[in-house]
Amino acid sequence: MTSQYVTEPPSSGLVDLVTSKGTISIALFPTQAPLACRNFLTLALEGFYDNLVFHRLIPNFILQTGDPSATGTGGESIYGEPFPIESHSRLKFNRRGLLGMAANQDRTNESQFFLTLDATPELTGKHTLMGKVEGKSIYTLVELVEGVELVDGDRPRYPIKLHEVRVVENPFDDLQPRTTKKQRIAEERRKKHEMETRVAEEQKRKRSKAKKNTGLLSFGAEEEAEDEVALKGPKSSHDLLKDDKHLSRQTIETSKSTKANTPAVSANISSKEKRFLAQSSSSTTPPAVTKQASKDGTSDAPHPTATLKSEHSGPSDQKASSSTGRDFLASQRAKYLSSSHPSTAKQDDSYSALLSFQSRLRTRPSSTTPIAKPLPSVGVDEVEEEAGEYGASDDDDDWRSHRLDAGGQPLVAGQNAGKDTLEDYEVLDPRDHTDRERNPKAESSRDGKRGRDWVEHDRKYQNDRSRRHREHDKHPQQRRQRSII
């Protein structure tokens, strides 16, 4: 492995591939591959590789990008045409992390390039090797292809994005980009707009009406038949089927006799309704018409399609359609609708009953029979017995005139009802250490005195106390004699 690094030529120039999973640093070989490196750096400075995707991934082989169309067939060259492959004896695809140019079928290069994911000696001499991955960014390359799901062999389902190819060190002093990134973006937008306009004009030209060919032998009849405009909206079987034997060719009969003698056909009629229709049709059919129909062997009943169409068109004669099943269905439907909703008479009766009940409650006179109040020393059973003795009744009609009396004094009474007085509250101030109730004279004597007066008062009190002590010490014999006596 060391011999491989020794044989490789020194690199000059550095670029960064900014991908969706990190940055990959690449050192270039501009001396051994000048055409490829100059083309690669110029396209990078012009912003050609910005926001592309890695459109091809072969595990343990290569990771390819550089095609704006993401199909593997696009790309461009700064030379105006593809340039040839540049091979060198000291550059070989013998490990992963090598940068090479993707060649066309005619062994020429444009803008597509790839990174090797393993040793690929079969590519040596067939593709231009122009760079290698530098430093720890090789781990970013490994992470870039890890866990990628492939479809159609080598296309990632969710392609990895190449945000930018940033030129860190340019090895060519005379290299100048043909245009800036902003100019390239504006040019791409202009080309895209021109392409969209061209496509819209082509579609409009195709939609334009072609000129009729009047030289046909049928004098343009076939041409007119081909140019029929297709109608939009729902179509019936008459529009789609030209010669259908299941469709009726007879016109709809609207005479009164036909309507009177033809029962309507409905798929939703029950057996009971069918019997009613049979009776009504037999009773309303004249005998002459019946005989004539039996002789001819034909029936005057129209096709079901015509019958349904006549039903949708609406009745034309009220008297003639009175015996048909349609009127029967209408009457049954009206009967059902009338029975499904509550009648207004029942609602009025319920409302009047409610009003009468409210009036009885409000007009009932209050009972004047006194009810005994329970005493605190009397039990519950005794209270019930006394209530029965004093006229308490369990009548059902008497509950409306009953008055609830809980007894006792009212909570709010008198003139000061609802008003607070000072006697209702007791103020306890923990900061007040004096006892005003026990020594009211001292409290009253304090009123009107200043701080200096209080100092003189305390001094006088101390002098009186010291004088009493001195007198007590001068006459101990007199105190002893007094105690003996």
Swiss-Prot record:
Q: Which GO terms describe its biological process?
A: mRNA processing; protein folding; RNA splicing
UniProt xrefs under Gene3D superfamilies: Cyclophilin-like
Ranges of Basic and acidic residues compositional bias?
184-204, 236-247, 428-465
State where it is primarily located. Answer: cytoplasm
- Report the catalytic activity: [protein]-peptidylproline (omega=180) = [protein]-peptidylproline (omega=0)
Q: Which residues form the PPIase cyclophilin-type domain?
A: 11-167
Which cellular components does GO assign to this protein?
catalytic step 2 spliceosome; cytoplasm
Instruction: Specify the superkingdom.
Output: Eukaryota
In residue numbers, the region (Disordered) covers 173-485
Subcellular localization is given as: Cytoplasm; Nucleus
One Pfam entry name = Pro_isomerase
PANTHER family attached to this UniProt entry: PEPTIDYL-PROLYL CIS-TRANS ISOMERASE-RELATED, SPLICEOSOME-ASSOCIATED PROTEIN CWC27 HOMOLOG
What this protein is reported to do is described as:
PPIases accelerate the folding of proteins. It catalyzes the cis-trans isomerization of proline imidic peptide bonds in oligopeptides. Involved in pre-mRNA splicing.
Output this protein's name: Peptidyl-prolyl isomerase CWC27
